């Protein structure tokens, strides 16, 4: 194997190598320091007289005397069923003190988006135990449903709660969680590890942790390692896999940092012009393949810079994914957990996974009525601030009280409270006792009211 010593420049995480034989895009590179230490890298760009290599580790010690060896293959992830229960670094190395992974296969981490013709229709309900998701923004198997948060909000706690509680009710199929955290602090990493071990959720999970002080380049690899693992578990071993990626904002910042080091022409707010395509190459790896037993469902979590939903990261994510769950600073200030605002939240595939035989026959009607009642109550709060509560009609006051009850009884729940879909819908019916039946009948069939309304239950 040839070793080149033609490094012309080191800029950030990048090495510029001159006069090499033809190499491939994304080819793996071994970097040999003067003291014999080896570091990993990958070909980022190539032309006739220059190759750009990104280093997966710190560039300390790299210089003109660094040896560069091109390995002739792309980054491959060693995968095995024994990965379940393991905690790995953002680069795929075990950090839980356990043995190295003995692979059944080595798979290219870049994978490929599912052929649209081969895609199955997502339809099976995934129960997260969180009412605001299960009841009004239902997650279905094979969907990609992001969570939009802001700095200082409890998105990490929500992510862990989903990882602990997610299941497909009534199904005997094997279920697994792949959890990938990018750009987190060491304190957050310890919190994640302790929670997984405390609750026993680690037994059915594979965890990847990329720390804030790890190289930015590794951050661009972490979600691909997680998805490669998920695809192996799903399509080769038949698992139904939920992939949680947090925080995609840190991933996009790494893209911007690498783009700046390459002196690329920036796009919106300094992010690379290809960020949409790059995000799509991650999100579109969710889904179901016809004829195969398993599935990959994604929940990417991102923090919106400045709580701005029009920022390029949430904006582009919204174009690719199938809805969004929005975490509200206002609800968080009220001390409500989880502070999920159902009004701007949406699950575009919800109707495929709910109803008779999947959740319950009243699910759609109850969801619509709760959404409508809460929206009207929130609008009335603005009116109360101007004219006062006493100026409202009796009907309007009931909707105002319904909005308060919705936040206090439906949205609010404990971080370890795992509600079934039946419990979630029954909470909704319990709140409907505050509204006149004439209002309920505008959206809910009379026979459903007589079946589920507490006033008619014996």
Curated annotation (Swiss-Prot):
Domain of life of the source: Archaea
InterPro entries reported for this sequence: ATP-synt_VA_C, ATPase_a/bsu_AS, ATPase_F1/V1/A1_a/bsu_N, ATPase_F1/V1/A1_a/bsu_nucl-bd, P-loop_NTPase, V-ATPase_su_B/beta
Membrane topology, from the record: Peripheral membrane protein
UniProt keyword list: ATP synthesis, Cell membrane, Hydrogen ion transport, Ion transport, Membrane, Transport
Annotated localization: Cell membrane
GO terms for MF: ATP binding; proton-transporting ATP synthase activity, rotational mechanism
Biological process, per Gene Ontology: proton motive force-driven plasma membrane ATP synthesis
Main location: membrane
Listed Pfam families: ATP-synt_ab (PF00006), ATP-synt_ab_N (PF02874), ATP-synt_VA_C (PF22919)
GO CC annotation: plasma membrane
NCBIfam families for this protein: PRK04196.1
PANTHER family assigned to the protein according to its UniProt record, in alphabetical order: V-TYPE PROTON ATPASE SUBUNIT B (PTHR43389:SF4)
Assembly mode: Has multiple subunits with at least A(3), B(3), C, D, E, F, H, I and proteolipid K(x).
Role of this protein: Component of the A-type ATP synthase that produces ATP from ADP in the presence of a proton gradient across the membrane. The B chain is a regulatory subunit.
Family to which the UniProt record says this protein belongs: Belongs to the ATPase alpha/beta chains family.
Entry-linked HAMAP family: ATP_synth_B_arch
Name of the featured protein: A-type ATP synthase subunit B
Organism: Methanocorpusculum labreanum (strain ATCC 43576 / DSM 4855 / Z)
């Amino acid at each position: 194997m040839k070793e080149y010593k033609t490094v012309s420049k080191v800029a950030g995480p990048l090495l510029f190598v001159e006069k090499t034989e033809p190499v491939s895009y994304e080819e793996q590179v071994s970097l040999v320091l003067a003291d014999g230490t080896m570091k990993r890298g990958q070909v980022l760009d190539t032309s006739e007289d220059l190759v750009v290599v990104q280093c997966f580790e710190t560039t300390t010690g790299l210089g003109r005397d660094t040896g560069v060896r091109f390995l002739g293959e792309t980054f491959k992830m060693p995968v095995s069923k024994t990965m379940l229960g393991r905690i790995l670094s953002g680069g795929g190395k075990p950090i839980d003190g356990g043995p190295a992974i003995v692979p059944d296969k080595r798979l290219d981490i870049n994978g490929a988006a599912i052929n649209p013709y081969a895609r199955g229709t997502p339809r099976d309900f995934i129960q997260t135990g969180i009412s605001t998701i299960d009841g009004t923004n239902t997650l279905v198997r094979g969907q990609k449903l992001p969570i939009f948060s802001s700095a200082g909000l409890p998105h990490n706690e929500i992510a862990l709660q989903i990882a602990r509680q997610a299941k497909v009710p009534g199904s005997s199929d094997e279920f697994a969680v792949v959890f990938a955290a990018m750009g987190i602090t060491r304190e957050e990493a310890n919190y994640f590890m302790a929670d997984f071990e405390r609750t026993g959720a680690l037994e059915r999970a594979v965890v990847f942790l990329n720390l804030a002080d790890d190289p930015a380049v590794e951050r661009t690899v972490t979600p691909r390692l997680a998805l490669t693992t998920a695809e192996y578990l799903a399509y080769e071993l038949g698992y139904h896999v939920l992939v949680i990626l947090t925080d995609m904002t840190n991933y996009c910042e790494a893209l911007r940092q690498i783009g700046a080091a390459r002196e690329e022409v920036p796009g919106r707010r300094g992010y690379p012009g290809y960020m949409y395509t790059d995000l799509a190459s991650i999100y579109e790896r969710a889904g179901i393949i016809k004829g195969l037993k398993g599935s990959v469902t994604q929940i990417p979590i991102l923090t919106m810079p400045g709580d701005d939903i029009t920022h390029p990261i949430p904006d582009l994510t919204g174009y690719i994914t199938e809805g969004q769950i929005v975490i509200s600073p206002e609800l968080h200030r009220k001390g409500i957990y989880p502070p999920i605002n159902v009004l701007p939240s949406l699950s575009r595939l919800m109707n495929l996974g709910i109803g008779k035989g999947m959740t319950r026959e009243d699910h759609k009607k109850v969801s619509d009525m709760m959404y409508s009642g809460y929206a009207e109550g929130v609008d009335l709060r603005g009116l109360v601030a101007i004219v006062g509560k006493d100026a409202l009609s009796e009907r309007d006051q009931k909707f105002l009280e319904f909005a308060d009850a919705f936040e206090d009884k439906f949205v609010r729940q404990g971080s370890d409270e795992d509600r079934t879909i039946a419990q979630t819908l029954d909470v909704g019916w319990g709140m409907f006792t505050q509204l006149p039946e004439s209002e309920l009948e505008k959206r809910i069939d009379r026979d459903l009211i007589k079946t589920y309304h507490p006033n008619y239950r014996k």
